């Protein structure tokens, strides 16, 4: 027998929001609940279908699996818990307002510990090779003196106001409202003899030393999550997480853009004219670069796979070196004389033969001036 579509059971669209799904369930559950329909087998079956549909569609994870794989994606979850029997009519309200004190269950609320953040500053070399850093962070941990109970005697008594539930429930007609117990702040218990170290909180701030492994290839702004290294949880709940924010310091030579590295490469006037070999630094050693004769300022040489390593996989970026031809300074009289002879040797038409860009620029200036003054 083919199973019915959960969306059709609740009479909602497949794009319905969580609020719309909850509203539809509440309306149908109140209509078909067995307490309202005693000895009505059809209503009982309908209520089971409604409850099962709501259990799946109200859970983001189950709903996603159902949308993708249909009933096969959620059947292994065991279906709706209500299929094995029914509680009182108030169960409907428990779904929306939390369980009532009439159930006698312990409502002491477990609270997950807070997440923490810590910024680690590393060099570009450390980002390239990866590094292990040791950090000290202040975080809330369970008090050793009272074993986290908050009590000198390590015992707690049930809160007289909420009877251990952690919440106080008020009912007005058909509707029930719940609020955190103001006496015990939702813990469900009270302490007669508060611990001197934690003042009854059960937690104390401590310095924790943690080793952080930073993988190769990390970039500025990346975050590393250390699960369970945040503040301690309450009433047996999980600890929070520690998020490490990566800050990569500026480098004296290289500028990073994604996986590529960029640098300026100064070369001498003679090297630019005649060509030759120069040593170029990279993050994992020097490489020899051949400079072709007549190299101009601004020319970019690409050294493949000499950039940053990838955070995921074995790929590497490139190193791009931009040439900057340096003009000689602090020349003595002999050197100046040689340069003057060199300039004379170029002849009157040196621009067309030896400085093509300069000639083009001056020609453009002349053409512009003629148009401007004509």
From Swiss-Prot:
Superkingdom as given in the UniProt entry: Bacteria
Ranges for the CXXCXGXG motif repeats: 143-150, 159-166, 181-188, 195-202
Domain J intervals: 5-70
Record text on cofactor binding: Binds 2 Zn(2+) ions per monomer.
Keyword terms, alphabetized: Chaperone, Cytoplasm, DNA replication, Metal-binding, Repeat, Stress response, Zinc, Zinc-finger
Any single biological process term in GO: response to heat
Gene: dnaJ
Lineage: Bacteria, Pseudomonadati, Pseudomonadota, Gammaproteobacteria, Thiotrichales
Pfam family, one: DnaJ_C
MF GO annotations: ATP binding; heat shock protein binding; unfolded protein binding; zinc ion binding
Zinc finger (CR-type) residue numbers: 130-207
Protein name as it appears in the record: Chaperone protein DnaJ
Subunit structure, interactors included: Homodimer.
